[in-house]
Amino acid sequence: MEDYVIIVNRIEDLQLTQDRSELELIFERAKRTIVGGQDVILVRQNRNGQEEKFQTISNEQDFEEYRKQVFRFL
């Protein structure tokens, strides 16, 4: 299994549209990655399409904190 990349811009868009089901799918995949021993990498995409990595989540506790933070705004 490979590391799972979450593009934070996409998460923010889904928060704005309150697309809970799509967010759940993303976070289910991410959790399976963590449980499988790989990392979840948070990146931000700039206007040129370049991705800038700004955080790596490697354990379930940190992942759950990030998940709560995202869903708190829905």
Each language-model region and where it sits:
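Short aromatic-glycine-(Arg/Gly/Cys) micro-motifs in beta-strand/loop hairpins
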Residues: 1-13
